[in-house]
């Protein structure tokens, strides 16, 4: 018995790549060694054998734990261990990602892995690199019977569906890495085939977000086009929050793999990497910018990459214009949000990931999930996320692959402090920020507000952005899932306005009962406040002159009574007549619309009521006429005038 045990090789708990059963291909072992992965992470050691062994898997693991390689290796191995190559224009595997950036990241990791498989590298090379001017030879070609993996990246916005289909028909890839929308468009083509004989495996990365409302419909339609006899893997940091939805996806007896991080002895397990320090800082809204500046300045080693999270796209737009003057000069600021055109998103994301100088990425939750951005040392959350699940993913951009990281969330003193015990209940312990120390004062806050306003006063367009951003921030605040903690009634509007450097508070329903200073202490000649853009300023001036010329309220006048005295009486009468006609038309239209919406029973009752009213009016008129005959002719008209109102309905209850 002892000899048999020795023949089995390393114990099952070993995380050596050579210890896997079934064993990995030699070229994959070479690839992971060249990439610097000396041994598997816990999630890889648990997932790869099961996924390669024909099991559906639901994997819940902390962010930054190596989930990408945990599904890429089994997918590639499955496609390369088939009995025969996948037919032309047939798809063997699909990897679905919720965001463009994450899909691109997965695709790049896949290419770096396939570079070690010669047939696949030769098939991929013509589309990813061109021959040099000297006519250097490319990799050797292989017979069509050779098994290889040819991936295609599908992203909405970067190319059109027609271009993607053309690439598919030309190269005949057998593996898609895609976002949900573009994948569905391509699968809808009659030229793209996913039959049971060819299709092997489906991977849903960041599965809980893929099942959110925004992706649910596309995902269901996609699944309807795929064979049920397939292997499916769902990977996320918070799978447990979407279990009910995952069941409906159609996994067949899945194995659930949950990889947690153990804290110190006696403490509960955590859902974040041990190398990541998650902290909070209590600060008034107007102190947030000075706090961010101090953290960036006083942290031990200057963070190479920092991610600053805001709640809305409009907020990112606004702060990307005003923050550069507030942060230390060595930091480069870059905006990234979901409403950017695809080329802008790609450009800014690449600039941030490839930056050699300290950089700050201003973003929304579009950059909160799955992205493996190297050298992220610091994450600051200017606004808490509306969805508590996003908190964990935001923090997880730092402290990846064993690198030390710091996450700081800025909360206002008071009810928002309850967010900390709320996170602890969700197994996400957060401690008070002690290092680096942050010393705040009203003087620093006032200086920050003044600097923001100086920047905004240079261009009226920034004021417009500020108003839009503030309104969008308020809207997002009202939509917090933790509504008992984040309450709109607790906002100090003047304090919040100063924190954003507003020149005045915007007009919005939430401020209807606000009785404070809407100008925030700012005195400004709004007519002279101009746009930097000459065309916009020209248009504004024209609108201003037009309003002054045609709107009597804009013209200086001694009093409203004098204007009324000089206006012709006939025109006043005409205006009144026109006004009455408009009212009558509106009333008739409302009655007509109301009548069309009524049921037949309601219409019958309405007719009966109308008939009763007419009879009563007729009766009252007859009585009125009878009285008028007995009265003097002098009093008859005034009496009619008195009785043409309520008296018409006298006796009707």
Curated annotation (Swiss-Prot):
SMART domains membership: DEXDc, DUF4217, HELICc
Chain intervals with Basic and acidic residues compositional bias:
572-581, 590-626
Residue stretches of biased makeup (Polar residues): 558-569, 627-636
Question: Which protein family is it in?
Answer: Belongs to the DEAD box helicase family. DDX55/SPB4 subfamily.
Enumerate the spans annotated as Helicase ATP-binding domain: 48-257
Give the residue spans that cross the bilayer. Answer: none
Gene name, per UniProt, is SPB4
Q: Which CDD domains match?
A: DEADc_DDX55 (cd17960), SF2_C_DEAD (cd18787)
Q: Where is this region: Disordered?
A: 534-653
Taxonomically, the superkingdom here is Eukaryota
The keyword Calcium belongs to this UniProt entry's keyword annotation = no
Keywords, in A-Z order: ATP-binding, Coiled coil, Helicase, Hydrolase, Nucleotide-binding, Nucleus, Ribosome biogenesis, RNA-binding, rRNA processing
**Lineage of this protein's species?**
Eukaryota, Fungi, Dikarya, Ascomycota, Pezizomycotina
Source species, please?
A: Coccidioides immitis (strain RS) (Valley fever fungus)
> Which biological process annotations from GO are given for this protein?
rRNA processing
**EC number(s) on record?**
3.6.4.13
Motif Q motif, residue range(s) on this chain = 17-45
**Coordinates of motif DEAD box in the sequence?**
205-208
SUPFAM superfamilies recorded: P-loop containing nucleoside triphosphate hydrolases
Q: What is this protein called?
A: ATP-dependent rRNA helicase SPB4
* Function in brief: ATP-binding RNA helicase involved in the biogenesis of 60S ribosomal subunits. Binds 90S pre-ribosomal particles and dissociates from pre-60S ribosomal particles after processing of 27SB pre-rRNA. Required for the normal formation of 18S rRNA through the processing of pre-rRNAs at sites A0, A1 and A2, and the normal formation of 25S and 5.8S rRNAs through the processing of pre-rRNAs at sites C1 and C2.
Q: Where is the composition biased (Acidic residues)?
A: 641-653
Q: Provide the primary localization.
A: nucleus
């Amino acid at each position: 018995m002892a000899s048999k045990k020795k023949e089995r090789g390393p114990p099952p708990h070993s995380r050596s790549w050579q210890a896997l059963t079934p064993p990995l291909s030699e070229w994959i072992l070479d690839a992971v060694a060249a990439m610097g992965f000396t041994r598997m992470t816990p999630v890889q050691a648990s997932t790869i054998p099961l996924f390669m062994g024909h099991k559906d898997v639901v994997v819940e693991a902390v962010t930054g734990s190596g989930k990408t390689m945990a599904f890429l290796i089994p997918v590639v191995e499955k496609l390369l261990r088939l009995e025969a190559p996948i037919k032309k224009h047939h798809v063997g595997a699909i990897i679905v990602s919720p965001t463009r950036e994450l899909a691109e990241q997965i695709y790049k990791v896949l290419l770096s892995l396939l570079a070690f498989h010669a047939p696949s590298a030769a098939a991929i090379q013509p589309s990813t690199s061109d021959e040099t001017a000297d006519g250097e030879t490319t990799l050797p070609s292989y017979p069509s019977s050779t098994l290889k993996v040819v991936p295609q990246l599908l992203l909405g916005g970067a190319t059109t569906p027609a271009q993607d289909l053309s690439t598919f028909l030309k190269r005949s890839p057998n593996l898609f890495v895609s976002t949900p929308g573009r994948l569905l468009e391509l699968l809808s083509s009659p030229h793209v085939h996913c039959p049971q004989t060819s299709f092997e495996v489906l991977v849903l990365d960041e599965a809980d977000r893929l099942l959110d409302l925004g992706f649910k419909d596309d995902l269901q339609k996609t699944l309807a086009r795929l064979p049920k006899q397939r292997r499916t893997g769902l990977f996320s940091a918070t799978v447990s929050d979407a279990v009910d939805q995952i069941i409906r996806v159609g996994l067949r007896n899945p194995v659930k793999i949950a990889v947690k991080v153990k804290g110190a002895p006696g403490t509960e397990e955590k859902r974040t990497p041990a190398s990541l320090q998650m902290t909070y800082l209590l600060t008034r809204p107007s102190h947030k910018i000075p706090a961010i500046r101090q953290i960036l300045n006083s942290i031990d080693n200057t963070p190479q990459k920092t991610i600053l999270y805001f709640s809305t796209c409009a907020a990112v737009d606004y702060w990307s214009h005003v923050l550069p003057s507030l942060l230390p000069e060595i930091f480069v600021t870059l905006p990234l949000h979901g409403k950017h055109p695809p080329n802008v998103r790609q450009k800014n994301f690449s600039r941030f990931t490839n930056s050699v100088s300290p950089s700050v990425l201003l973003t929304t939750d579009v950059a909160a999930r799955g992205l493996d951005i190297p050298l992220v040392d610091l994450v600051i959350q200017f606004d808490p996320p509306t969805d508590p699940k996003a908190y964990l993913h935001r923090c997880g951009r730092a402290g990846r692959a064993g690198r030390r990281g710091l996450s700081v969330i800025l909360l206002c003193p008071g009810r928002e402090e309850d967010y900390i015990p709320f996170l602890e209940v969700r197994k996400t312990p957060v401690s008070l920020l002690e290092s680096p120390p942050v010393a705040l004062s009203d003087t620093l806050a006032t200086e920050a507000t003044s600097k923001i306003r100086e920047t905004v006063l240079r261009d009226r367009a920034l004021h417009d952005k500020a108003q839009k951003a503030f309104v969008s921030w308020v809207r997002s605040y009202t939509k917090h899932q933790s509504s008992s903690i984040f309450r709109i009634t607790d906002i100090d509007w003047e304090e919040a306005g100063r924190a954003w450097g507003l020149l005045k508070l915007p007009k919005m329903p939430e401020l209807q009962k606000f009785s404070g200073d809407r100008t925030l202490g700012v005195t400004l000649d709004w007519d002279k406040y101009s746009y930097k853009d000459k065309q916009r300023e020209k248009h504004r001036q024209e609108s201003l002159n037009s309003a002054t010329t045609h709107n009597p309220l804009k013209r200086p006048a001694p009093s409203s009574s004098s204007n009324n005295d000089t206006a012709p009486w006939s025109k006043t009468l005409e205006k009144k007549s026109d006004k009455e006609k408009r009212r009558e038309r509106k009333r008739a239209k409302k009655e007509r619309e109301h009548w069309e919406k009524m049921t037949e029973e309601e219409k019958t009752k309405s007719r009966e009521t109308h008939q009763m009213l007419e009879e009563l009016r007729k009766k009252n008129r007859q009585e009125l006429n009878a009285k008028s005959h007995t009265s003097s002719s002098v009093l008859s008209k005034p009496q009619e005038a008195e009785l043409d109102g309520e008296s018409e309905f006298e006796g009707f209850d």
